[in-house]
Amino acid sequence: MFHNTCGRKGRFARAMGMALAISVTLSGCSTVSDWFADEEELEIRRLKPIDAKFTPSVKWDRDIGDGVDHYFSRLRPVYAYENLYAADRHGSVVAMNPENGDVLWERDFAVFEGDGWWDSIARLWRSGASARIGGISVADRLLFVGTENGVVMALDYETGETKWEASVPGEVLAAPSADEGILVVNTGAGTLFGFDTRTGEQLWRHEGDTPPLTLRGISGPVAANGGALIGTPTGKLQVNLLESGILAWETVIATPTGATELERIVDLDTTPVLFGGTIYTVSYNGTLAAVELRSGRIIWKREYGSYRNLSIEGNSIFVVDNNSNIYALDRRNGVELWSQGSLKSRSVTAATPVGEHIVVGDNWGFVHWIEQETGQIVARVDVGGDDEDDAIYDAPLNVDGVVVTMTRNGVVAAISTL
């Protein structure tokens, strides 16, 4: 919830990592962090045995930069036009072949302030001021990049060439979304923007309310069906007209309660899920809802709280709550089908449907396969070395049945079950 351009400081970091790994092995400990873990944390880290039905394996991995470090981030790879795109928070943007991880092109948007001989040497392991990339998406043969510095860029999907750049007054902490030639960008300042995808011209903006205290993060927008769907930090789900930005409707999903600002947090920080004519969303303080797209009418509500994105496969909706409990519900009526609590407190990611399973990552770099029908964990693989620095911090990506993950340290891995 945090090395080639694909890793300038990697030469030094990996050398140190090898030395540490040797010392750890000799001492008989699994990781350095074990030395400092209390019994409660060790209990969380001890995974319960499973009856594995298959054995996933890492097909390839690639270090694409410095990752997201300890920062909260929803930066994750994107698959489009038969290419895999990934970025690190610091500024590296990379296009890869999804079959083998080979780099097709790369850009570095980190800011360098000096050009002296010492700066040239220092760049071997550091890469300037962070571009603070917050999210990437692909549409209209363009790769869109949003940053916490309030910059939105469009890159050519084949070459990485910058096509246009715009500024917004606020942090872009979630991937933009595009439809019908309009790019929708949400900001931490509560303002929603519409840009022309081809030219970068600002078409509209919509000002929203921001309470005194909110979560670190924002709802990712969804541009679809002539609307821009968004969750707000005030507990509302809203739809703006895509062409003009005018508010079509808004519906209260969660209401503030409690005496303190902390108790009154009601953020809808997840990206809404549009399935058929229904929007699904969930609030941090405990409201999962299905809402009619045309009218904003609430179809059903249930008490589940989360800041993780929802996912849907068939008639099931999958929820990972604030404590890393995993649930499957019938999306038509909100009836709970099963729950899985054995990964509790492991900072589990949102679930990604892959075939007959859902796949989640966790805070110690493990990836788990769970049967959609039963909720049983049937396979797992260690991608991060049981180390929090290599946590899987956001939902895995499904690329034609191959699971792609990214660790906090910036390692993109493709995992096969064949």
UniProtKB/Swiss-Prot annotation:
A lipid is attached at residue 29 (S-diacylglycerol cysteine). SUPFAM superfamilies: Quinoprotein alcohol dehydrogenase-like (SSF50998). Gene3D superfamilies: YVTN repeat-like/Quinoprotein amine dehydrogenase. It is a lipid-anchor. SMART domains: PQQ. It is found in: Cell outer membrane. Keywords: Cell outer membrane, Lipoprotein, Membrane, Palmitate, Signal. Residues 1-28 form the signal peptide. The keyword Transmembrane does not apply. The keyword Lipid biosynthesis does not apply. One of its GO terms (cellular component) is cell outer membrane. A lipid is attached at residue 29 (N-palmitoyl cysteine). One of its GO terms (biological process) is Gram-negative-bacterium-type cell outer membrane assembly. Part of the outer membrane protein assembly complex, which is involved in assembly and insertion of beta-barrel proteins into the outer membrane. Part of the Bam complex. Belongs to the BamB family. NCBIfam families: assembly_YfgL, PRK11138.1. This is Outer membrane protein assembly factor BamB. The gene is bamB.
